[in-house]
Amino acid sequence: MHLGVEEPIRECQYNQICTHNSSPMDTPHIKKKKNKRKWQVFPGRNRFYCNGRIMMAKQTGVFYLTMVLILVTSGLFFAFDCPFLASNLTPAIPAIGGVLFVFVMGMLLRASFSDPGVLPRATPEEAADIERQIDANNGPSGPGYRPPPRTREVLINGQTVKLKYCFTCKIFRPPRASHCSLCDNCVDRFDHHCPWVGNCVGRRNYRFFYLFILSLSFLTIFIFAFVITHVILNALRKALALSTAADFEAVQKDPTGLAFLVLSKTALLDILEVVVCFFSVWSIVGLSGFHTYLISSNQTTNEDIKGSWSSKRGKGNYNPYSYGNFITNCCSALCGPLPPSLIDRRGFIQPDTPQPATQTNGTSACPPNQVQSHMCAQDQCIQSTKFVLQAATNPLLHSQPVILGGGPPLQAKTSLGGPCSTMGPPQPSLPSSIPGLSCGGELMALRDSEIHCHHHLHHQHFISPEETPSPPAPLPCATHLGHHVHPAQLFDPVSQDSLHEDSVRGLVKLSSV
């Protein structure tokens, strides 16, 4: 009878169930915690306002300086210059200035408060799948083995483009995407990080950034020109208003005195406006011209600085994204459809789900609820990125099933960090003590692996009975099948992968966070 053997196995499985993180029963005197939104646990270094509707970089000091300069300069112009110009020249001047000011502020806020095109980070399952693919492609590694760089190559309009692997986001970045070190996010069609707008400039806000600097150039030139006009007209008006002949004769004898007499009565605020506009117009107009050149050639600032499509890299190197036409490139950058945001900022975090416990110093223990809740929240904040990569490159390969005995065991993922880097995955075996599995001589060799499997299960804790792997079902013997059966063929790869994934899933999530 094998009942005496089954009882310790069941007892071991029951002991693996951890109840420290089980969901408590609803009681009337305990208030339920309000579910957090996903922006509250966003992994990047960003600031969110208005309950996640506004997304900015963490460094916003220069952005406020931009706001102050625009508001102060425009306010002085509308308060002191526009009344004189409207009464002496035309009322269209303050009207045009007002339209330009509203447009500039609208484009600035739109570029600053928008999602620039942040790419979601890989889920723990995707990160583990990519790690398995990379390890499988690199082959076995020796003590002095140096793995090759993690890149993939795609062909875009006849030009080979490399997709680099991001060790922070655990993804192969799409073409033209880059990781911003300040915001700690991968941004699609990354142009640059602009501190003046307090945000990254990418695919989703580049048009607003360009329209902001272009309209700001017109507004700066407009204010600079009409402030000088106001100063000149006011000086001429006061020079002609000299009433006494004595003053007029004194001024004629001393031309420098005329200038001092006129300028001393000119508003100092007009001079302040002229100075601010004079030093601003050169940088803003130059920046607008540079980005006009980039749009006309369908490049980004990042690509231009690195010289990605420069002819110095070779005669066959060219920009595969350019349409070869100025108008078409401008329409593509400014008039194309705006892609939707790929991150769910205002979604709710679901209640905590059970997570496998980690191993520390050879003993198993359930992690604290606070750490587990934060891990679960960040896991739900990260969305799938496979559809993003499929749009830019070939589909991601699925992990190959591991068949026991058919090849070398799966190695531990050293690049993920955490407990998974030191603990190899368990190798499930056929428990020969279960009835019906001790009739073949070929199965006797599996008893050693059975002991290893039970020893590994004894050091694991599963949070809920649903995640506890059930004992393997009785399998037919080789003698009953009537022909020789290799032990590797008695296992279903799916069941073996499920046992491995159940025991490692929580560890991968901890290491990926």
Swiss-Prot record:
Matches recorded under Pfam families: DHHC
GO biological process: peptidyl-L-cysteine S-palmitoylation
Principal subcellular localization: endoplasmic reticulum
TM stretches of this protein: 60-80, 89-109, 208-228, 267-287
EC number: 2.3.1.225
Keywords on record: Acyltransferase, Endoplasmic reticulum, Golgi apparatus, Lipoprotein, Membrane, Palmitate, Phosphoprotein, Transferase, Transmembrane, Transmembrane helix
Domain comment (free text): The DHHC domain is required for palmitoyltransferase activity.
Family designation: Belongs to the DHHC palmitoyltransferase family. ERF2/ZDHHC9 subfamily.
Protein name: Palmitoyltransferase ZDHHC14
Organism: Danio rerio (Zebrafish)
Gene symbol of the encoding locus: zdhhc14
